[in-house]
Structures are given as C-alpha cells and as structure tokens.
Amino acid sequence: MAPVATATPFLPTISNETTLRQTFVRDEDERPKVAYNVFSSEIPVISLEGIDEVDGRRAEICKKIVAACEDWGVFQVVDHGVDAGLISDMTRLAREFFALPPEDKLRFDMTGGKKGGFIVSSHLQGEAVQDWREIVTYFSYPIRARDYSRWPDKPEDWRSVTKTYSEKLMELACKLLGILSEAMGLDTEALTKACVDMDQKVVVNFYPKCPQPDLTLGLKRHTDPGTITLLLQDQVGGLQATKDGGKTWITVQPVEGAFVVNLGDHGHFLSNGRFKNADHQAVVNSNTSRLSIATFQNPAPDAIVYPLAIREGEKPVLDEPITFAEMYRRKMSRDLELANLKKLAKTENQQVAEKAEVEAVVQPKGLSEILA
C-alpha cells in the first residue's frame, strides 16, 4: 500500500491569497486600533554606555531604567555591548530560514510536543483564531538542556551564530537584572539568583505581508510570563503596548540595533508590582514583512515566586510563595477561562440577535395597522 500523503499546512509566507482566511479573523474588540507605522516616542531609549563604571554614569542609567520599569515596564537599550555584526548575522540568517522551501522548515515542525523547532500560525491556549506569523524557536539555557537536533541545520552557520547570540543576550539580561536588583535595595545578583537556574528561550518571529491586516494580529495581546524579555526588531514597526488595559495602544518606534526590553509577570511579582509587566501585541501590514527576535529569560520551573522586597506600607501582591511552574499553570488556566467566557458570551449574543431577527419577521401586525 502506498503511503498516505500528508497535506502541507497553510504557510502565510507562501500565501498569495487576497482575502484573509476566517481562521485568522479576530473579533472586532481585538483588532488593531493603531497602525503599524504610527510610532510613539513614549517608550524611552536608554544608552548603557558606562553601565559597568562605578561612578555617576551607572547611577544615572539605573535611575532611567527604574523610571521606565515603574511607568511602562518597557524601554529600549542602545550601546548595549552586543556586536552589531552578530546582530546583522542573526537577522540575515533568520530571514534566510523563513525563505526556505516549506519542506525544509517543516522538518523541524514542533507538533506532537517536540521542544523547539518550527511553528506555523500559532494561537494562544483555548483559542481557535490564529496569529499571522511563522516561528522558529529554540531553548538555549540551561546549556545541559540544549537539544541541537531541534535547532535548524539550515541556513549554514545558523547553529553557531544562534549559540553566540544566546550567550551575549544572557549576559545583557543579567546585567539589566542587576540594575533592577540594586534599585530594590538588594544585592546585584538577587534577581538572577531568584531564577535559580535561568532558562532562556529564543523565539524568531516572521510576520509576512497580510492581505487584510486590519482584521487580524501577528501576535495577540498578552504579558510575558517570565522575568525579562529582550526583543530585537527590524525597522518596519508593529510592536504595540498598552498600560491602560487596552483602551489606548502605542506602536513602539523601531531603533536600529536597539533591544526592546520588557518585564514579565515573574519580574513584576518579584518587585511586588513596583515594576510593570505591560500588555503588548504585534500588528501586521500589507506592504512588507516584519522580523523580530524575542529572547525570554525565565526562572527554573521550581524557582519560588514571591516578592523579594516589600516597601513600607505595601502588601504582598501574592498570597503565598508558589513555584514558577505553578504560576505559569495558573496563568494558562486564567487565559483559557477568559477565552471560554468570551466564546460563551459571543455565542449568547449571536443567539439573542438571531432570535430578535426571527421575531421581527414574524411579528403580527397590530389592529391599527390592519384597519389603516
């Protein structure tokens, strides 16, 4: 018997369709409110030049980072010490990967619970609507947990460059966590130590041109669960953030060679809510593709989540210490519950509307209308 052919999944990168598939269409309240290229200057750009010097420079940098974390929980860093050539190589190789034929990318398909590889049109737990993107991801720390069989072997040099990139981003993340630890009145290593054995996951996002970008998202609104995230993005634009519950959104201005830094839920809890964990999302456009590389720094699953410093007059934002694994499980449960509640409300509203339409059609005429 001949083997059954497996259908190639829909890949946005090779789509020539002019109408968005229904599986990507978002409810109206989730659709973009601000264009991908209407940029805001609200997110500060902070130079890290002199961060290792024990003088006024470090104190000034610390002050700026803390202010940004207390306001938005998002800022950009330049003069960060990550080589421009490495950044260029990483972005070039990422684009080359997504330009590969489908069969080359799908060799690293993550379906079936595989850890690391290629994902097509992901969606958050409990949702049917898909994000307009393709992803390749790999787990780089702890080093002993690396599974190079899940790291793509194309294009050439991918593994060597991504390995170096991961190491440099780990160094930068620890440096930033040191600043925040000091701001909380703790030892420089406090936040890093709270992660126990820091986990690092790199997610390379490719957002292809979209036929109807006003109907969908590249990545739905969310907060990151981990400690801190460093995002490298190209100059297209599409990263958006909100700090008022989604009433207003801003598009982060791309800065050449900069990393966008945002605090995750774990970092928010460790600071007892002092440092914000901003909701953010990615929008797409019909003119050009967009690339971003997110490096997530997360605590070990068994790391304890509880405020490290509670200021006078404050109450802990958590009732009790829990593990990061439990914190993440609760987050996923809440997300699933909210998705189900929204789905139920949508169904009920549709039923009410349909009933109203039927009643409007069969409504008998009043006596005055008959005798008129």
From Swiss-Prot:
**One GO MF term, please?**
L-ascorbic acid binding
Name the pathway: Flavonoid metabolism
Q: Say yes or no: keyword GTP-binding present.
A: no
Question: Record's PROSITE patterns?
Answer: FE2OG_OXY (PS51471)
BP GO annotations: flavonoid biosynthetic process
Task: Write down how the cofactor binds this protein.
Answer: Binds 1 ascorbate molecule per subunit. Binds 1 Fe(2+) ion per subunit.
Q: Which InterPro entries does this one have? A: DIOX_N, IPNS-like_FE2OG_OXY, IPNS-like_sf, Oxoglu/Fe-dep_dioxygenase_dom, Plant_2OG-oxidoreductases
On whether Iron is a keyword of this UniProt record, the answer is yes
Residues that bind 2-oxoglutarate, according to the entry? Answer: 290
Q: Where does Fe cation bind?
A: 222, 224, 280
Q: What does this protein do?
A: Catalyzes the 3-beta-hydroxylation of (2S)-flavanones to 2R,3R-dihydroflavonols, which are intermediates in the biosynthesis of flavonols, anthocyanidins, catechins and proanthocyanidins in plants. Can act on naringenin to produce dihydrokaempferol, and on eriodictyol to produced dihydroquercetin.
Member of which family? Belongs to the iron/ascorbate-dependent oxidoreductase family.
- Its protein name is Flavanone 3-dioxygenase F3H2
Phylogenetic classification of the source organism: Eukaryota, Viridiplantae, Streptophyta, Embryophyta, Tracheophyta
